[in-house]
Amino acid sequence: MTLEHDRKGISIAVSAEVQAALDAGQPVVALESTVISHGLPYPHNLELALAMEQEVRDQGAVPATVGIVAGVPTVGMDAAAIRRFAHPDPHHPPLKVSRRDIGYVVAAGGDGATTVAATMALAHLAGVQVFATGGIGGVHRGARETWDVSADLTELERTPVLVVCAGAKAILDLPATLEYLETGGVPVLGWRTAEFPAFYSVSSGLPVAYAQDASFVARAWKAHRALGGAGMVLAVPPPVEDAIDRAVVEAAIERALNRAVKEGVHGPAVTPFLLAALARETEGESVRANVALLRQNARIAAQVATAIAGI
């Protein structure tokens, strides 16, 4: 059963479990659906989606997987919807949806897998404060020529959701991404680290503010919001046992970027192309690291959401 919230004639479905938790002031963690439909192949994508939800539950919080299901923005997708996104009709797969695409997919009555930006937007409408993902988008390498900057960054500037991630995706220009976030007034905290993680790698050499535990993150979030701030990033290094050496990742990225240029890949197709190329270059190590950090981020996000609920 879901509860329908009408917003100027547009319905937003919030699962009964999620709504009950929100009403009771209990911790809720949003999860994106792009990782289901545009991440791993079936059945690994389904296994990961369910594992992330279980990581959240194991910490005493309620998971809320976000997506657009048959034209209805949904916060707290049920098992049937998650399975449909994981193994869709090949003729009608879910569209990859950022904030700009939400209205289009709703009007078309289709399925939409939400990116970081769209997940933040819908989670906030439902009242969810914490969101776990793999990595945020950011400023792409070569953005001086292409102007390719992810909508995730502008969403963080305006939408009050705390995003728990492994930093920005490694294929991006990490220094420029941090500069953009600073300009937008978006705090970036490192989970038990003073260095910005580089997604697959533990560190990038770029400094961030140190956060020692969930209680501190919760207090920082409350203060940030009370003083008019919007989004916040909690950057969590990947598990050490699954991390990949930064030099190895950079070499693989350079080769992948050269291939992208030669093959004329551009726009929204760049990120999936590069991630697939990285998986080949690292013989699957990047995929294993991605799965490990996603599960870890879900777990830590639940701890943070619990700490926020306890203040």
UniProtKB/Swiss-Prot annotation:
Co-factor binding details: Binds 1 Mn(2+) ion per subunit.
Keyword Manganese carried by entry: yes
InterPro entries named among the record's database cross-references: Indigdn_synthA-like (IPR022830), PsuG (IPR007342)
GO cellular component, one term: cytoplasm
The entry's keywords: Glycosidase, Hydrolase, Lyase, Manganese, Metal-binding
Reactions catalysed according to its record: D-ribose 5-phosphate + uracil = psi-UMP + H2O
Any one Gene Ontology molecular-function term assigned to this protein's record: pseudouridylate synthase activity
Swiss-Prot/TrEMBL cofactor(s): Mn(2+)
Domain of life of the native organism: Bacteria
EC category: lyase
Ligand binding (Mn(2+)): 148
Keyword Lyase: yes
Catalytic residues of the enzyme: 32, 169
Binding site for substrate: 96, 116, 150-152
GO terms under biological process: nucleobase catabolic process
Cited function: Catalyzes the reversible cleavage of pseudouridine 5'-phosphate (PsiMP) to ribose 5-phosphate and uracil. Functions biologically in the cleavage direction, as part of a pseudouridine degradation pathway.
Assembly, per entry: Homotrimer.
Family label: Belongs to the pseudouridine-5'-phosphate glycosidase family.
Protein name as it appears in the record: Pseudouridine-5'-phosphate glycosidase
Organismal lineage: Bacteria, Bacillati, Chloroflexota, Chloroflexia, Chloroflexales
